[in-house]
Structure formats: structure tokens, C-alpha cells
Design a protein with these regions (language model features):
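N-terminal intrinsically disordered, cationic/polar leader segments
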Residues: 1-170
């Protein structure tokens, strides 16, 4: 089941509230007594190139990226909301995206990204570390694609793991 999930999000400086839309999904299967539930989210974020920052005197190139995350967890024991996974992903990026930004917000976002440069591999690694530590999650799959602003290709990274209960495939 796919749906658009709206989260009321405030801009970082002016605190203007605006709904952000996230593509989400629920997948459920029942095989005998084995019930499996998967929550999926697609989270847009900003990445800022560490290499570009290191070699440039004035700036660095950045791009919008989409992180796709699916988590399998026991709904009988735990609750995980789309917001939980959205916040996890955004905390691992160079900067979150916002629905509305005034100039002071734009300054904050671009400077925050500049102070937190990350390749897609860095973002993926940070997400994986947090997911491995989350006792609620049995299994996960995460993928990130950055829509490169100065290259003729996109950057991409992927990882899937069964963390608990001997899960090995997604």
C-alpha cells in the first residue's frame, strides 16, 4: 500500500510551518504463523560534496538526494512511525529539506550543509549504523541517489541487512 504522508515541518530560523510530503508504503505478508510487516519511506535530503569543499576557495557543490528506506519490524512488540524513519534519515544527511524557506532559513541550511559535507556513501553508512543499533528493527534496506549538479551521472549507494532473527534477505 503506497501513500503520501504529510509532516508539518518548521523552517529552521523563521519557524514557518509548512507540510512536507513524503512517499511511504506499508507491505504485509502472512505465511502460516509468520507475519511480516515492512514500512517504507522516501526522504529527500541535501548532500554537499566533501571533495568540492576541500578544493574550492569559496563554496562547494551540493545536490538533492532521495533516500529510500524499508524496515521490517515486529508490529506486535514495537511501533515505528514514518516520522521516526524520516528523522533518522534527515539526521544523517548534510541537511534536511524544508517546504518553505525565507532568506535567513536558506542561509542557515546552506551553511549547515557546508559544515556537514557528505558523500552518498557517508549518508548511507550513518543510516546503517543507526539502524543496526535500533532494537526494534529486524531487517532493513536502504538506498540513496544524489542528483548530481555538476556531473553527468548520479551518485548511488545501497545496503540491505538482516539484523536480528537470522533474517538474511529482504
Amino acid at each position: 500500500f503506497k501513500f503520501t504522508y504529510f509532516v508539518d515541518k518548521k523552517s529552521p530560523v523563521t519557524k514557518l510551518s509548512f507540510p512536507m510530503a513524503y512517499d511511504c508504503s506499508f507491505e504485509g505478508t502472512l505465511d502460516g504463523d509468520n507475519y511480516r510487516f515492512v514500512l517504507g519511506v522516501k526522504v529527500p535530503v541535501t548532500t554537499l560534496c566533501p571533495c568540492s569543499k576541500e578544493i574550492s576557495e569559496y563554496s562547494a557543490h551540493n545536490q538533492r538526494a532521495i533516500v529510500k528506506l524499508k524496515v521490517n519490524y515486529d508490529r506486535q512488540k514495537y511501533s515505528i512511525w514514518p516520522e521516526d524513519m524520516i528523522e533518522l534519515v534527515e539526521s544523517c544527511s548534510s541537511s534536511p529539506l524544508y517546504g518553505i524557506l525565507k532568506r535567513s532559513d536558506e542561509k542557515f541550511v546552506t551553511e549547515a550543509a557546508y559544515e556537514n559535507p557528505k558523500f552518498v556513501e557517508d549518508i548511507l553508512r550513518d543510516i546503517v549504523v543507526k539502524l543496526r543499533k535500533d532494537k526494534r528493527i529486524n531487517q532493513f534496506e536502504t538506498e540513496i541517489e544524489a542528483f548530481e549538479s555538476i556531473h553527468n551521472h548520479n551518485a548511488w549507494a545501497y545496503q540491505s541487512e538482516g539484523v536480528k532473527n537470522n533474517e538474511t534477505t529482504f
